Amino acid sequence: MQWRAVWRHTHRHDSAHAVRLLDVVIDGHNDLAWAMRQLCDYDLSMVDLSQSVPGIHTDIPRLRAGEVSGQFWSVYAPSTLSGAEAVVVTLEQIDFVRRFVARFPGDLALATSADEVVAARASGRIASLIGLEGGHCIDESLGVLRIMHALGARYMTLTHNHNAPWADSATDEPVLGGLSSFGEDVVREMNRLGMLVDLSHVSADVMRHALAVTAAPAIFSHSCARALVDVPRNVPDDVLTALAANGGICMIAFVPDFVSAPFATWFGEQERGVVGSPAPVVTVDDLADHIDHVRDVAGIDHVGIGGDFDGSAYMPPELNDVSTYPRLLAALSARGWTPRDLGYLCSGNILRVLRAAEDTAHAHG
């Protein structure tokens, strides 16, 4: 039985508004653009994304099956790149997203605001938003940041796996102990533009520093709870508490080494060349535990979904592509999540945060 049918049977007396909220899943992070670079050098004539495509997590039929009505498409340049090379690769990624959307106008609609997300949903199309992954892609230039915004980018992850010159990464040796003065300027300019400040990938000190600087709600586009799995990419409880005070949202990733402590240990062994043991199984309930934890610490208004599909070589077997969101939502329903709360998780919270960022930009004039 589909998750929506389960909820309507279990919560049949809830409001029609709450049920309508369930029709919308807005995911915070998907790396299809990079997967297509690797698969076919962005050539949409070689890979038909209107059909099921083996070897990747994402295509239009599976987005439809997963009840996805909004997607932040990550535009990514490896953090080993810098300067003009990182800018060019990022622009190529933006170009791919825009061509992808234009190629399938009956299924996809470019969105740059909360109202455009809602309008796309009303027209039966998947709202397609753009998120920059890694502040190295602006080459230490607020002018480049502004151009990226003009091309449709509506969030920027401040770092990727390596430090930016102005912000420390979670997975690199700390240099600054937070943001530099230019890093603070980046956050303020993002506020002025209406771009969401994304704190996935950054060090815990940058998380705290950025939350102290930003005038608009921040996001974690694809992270989990560090109290459950103690890896640098996850979010400590004190930061979740600060995020709630900020009005922001932590969008939970499906990446197994963020979700499961045994898998994180196994994954670390693989990276060190230790072989022989099979990968621990990561379940839907493991992921649901992180969502429950963020709700319990930060509140129902501050949790969302950011799967990171096509951004990880591993995914939980039950959540192995974009068609599988209903399995997660059914598991949460079985735990007692109401239709209204599931609506906040799926779309209500991120739409609120988008609107708040827009309001902050308008207040800046």
Task: Identify the function of each model-found stretch.
Residues M1-L176, D230-G365:
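N-terminal hydrophobic targeting/anchoring segments and the immediately downstream early-domain regions
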Residues C137-D139, A150-R233:
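Divalent metal-binding pocket/active-site signature
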